[in-house]
UniProtKB/Swiss-Prot annotation:
This is Lipoyl synthase 2. Its main location: cytoplasm. It comes from Gloeobacter violaceus (strain ATCC 29082 / PCC 7421). [4Fe-4S] cluster 1 binds at C43, C48, C54, S282. It catalyses: [[Fe-S] cluster scaffold protein carrying a second [4Fe-4S](2+) cluster] + N(6)-octanoyl-L-lysyl-[protein] + 2 oxidized [2Fe-2S]-[ferredoxin] + 2 S-adenosyl-L-methionine + 4 H(+) = [[Fe-S] cluster scaffold protein] + N(6)-[(R)-dihydrolipoyl]-L-lysyl-[protein] + 4 Fe(3+) + 2 hydrogen sulfide + 2 5'-deoxyadenosine + 2 L-methionine + 2 reduced [2Fe-2S]-[ferredoxin]. The gene is lipA2. HAMAP family: Lipoyl_synth. Pathway: Protein modification; protein lipoylation via endogenous pathway; protein N(6)-(lipoyl)lysine from octanoyl-[acyl-carrier-protein]: step 2/2. Belongs to the radical SAM superfamily. Lipoyl synthase family.
Length: 289
């Protein structure tokens, strides 16, 4: 049984964890293109603190297969419940949005779709094919659920050759059952290991959200475990409680602590590291280290 401290962080958000949502002029272009096509972004559904910055740069992370997840992890803003029917036009709509925004690097993610026979793996591929049909030079990163660990699903996405395959381990081993629903530490490591086994040339990536009660030593252990399965890239960010119904914040890690963890990650051999309070999975994903 998980032993958790009842101590939580102050309800007052530190200044360094605050960011403006931006002005209408900054976000209007991306919002218009996305909303006109009834598309979804994790920027909006996940209430990402960086969405104004990304929208101002005309970038977004597209959320495939609807805004409703078949899981309901305690930290996540995305709605959980009965998943919606797939929109057969979604892959082409995403491709059109990518073209209109002039994107050279695209991140595709999705809700968990445990209701689908292939967990949604084929939908990633269809969307990638639609994007490449318009511009084969676009680089595509995928941020996938764990596909219940089914290697056939992982192989389906790997065969489409994304430039980077991201699957987030989210938290340290001890806190998995506390923070994640229907997911495990070992399975997430196995997903990343499978990608490297299937195609060693594809970059693999994972991320952690700190603030659930983990210790520095546990974070370092997780970074080491990620490196053991060949993970190339990592993101470290601060968990921010979306609402009172979500898991509480147990600690606000400081910018200095994030900087130190980022330096440790680089020393461990991660080739691409993003570490800071407001860092999220696709933050500056297409930019060099």
């Amino acid at each position: 049984m998980l032993a958790m401290s009842h101590q939580t962080a102050s309800s007052r958000l530190p200044e360094w964890a605050r960011r403006t949502i931006g002005t209408a002029s900054q976000v209007s272009t991306v919002e218009k293109i996305v909303k006109q096509r009834s598309l979804h972004t994790i920027c909006e559904e996940g209430r990402c603190p960086n969405r104004a910055e990304c929208y101002a740069q005309k970038t977004a992370t597209f959320l495939l297969m609807g805004p409703v997840c078949t899981r309901a992890c305690g930290f996540c803003q995305v709605a959980g419940g009965k998943a919606l029917p797939l929109d057969p036009q979604e892959p082409e709509k995403v491709a059109e949005a990518v073209a209109l925004l002039g994107l050279k690097y695209v991140v595709l993610t999705s809700v968990a779709r445990d209701d689908l026979p292939d967990q949604g793996a084929g939908w990633f591929v269809r969307t990638m094919e639609s994007i490449r049909a318009r511009n084969c030079a676009v680089e595509i990163e995928v941020l996938t659920p764990d596909f219940r660990g089914e290697e056939a699903c992982i192989a389906t996405v790997v065969a489409a050759r994304p430039v980077c395959f991201n699957h987030n381990i989210e938290t340290v081993r001890r806190l998995q059952s506390y923070a994640r629903r229907a997911a495990t530490y070992a399975r997430s490591l196995a997903v990343l290991a499978a990608v490297k086994r299937l195609d060693a040339e594809i970059f693999t990536k994972s991320g952690l959200m700190l603030g659930h009660g983990e210790t520095r030593e546990e974070v370092l252990e997780t970074l080491l475990d990620l490196r053991k399965v060949g993970c190339d890239r990592v993101t470290l960010g601060q968990y921010l409680q979306p609402s009172k119904d979500h898991l509480p914040v147990h600690k606000y890690w400081t910018p200095a602590e994030f900087a130190e963890l980022g330096a440790v990650a680089r020393d461990l051999g991660f080739a691409h590291v993003r570490s800071g309070p407001l860092v999220r999975s696709s933050y500056h994903a297409g930019e060099p280290e």
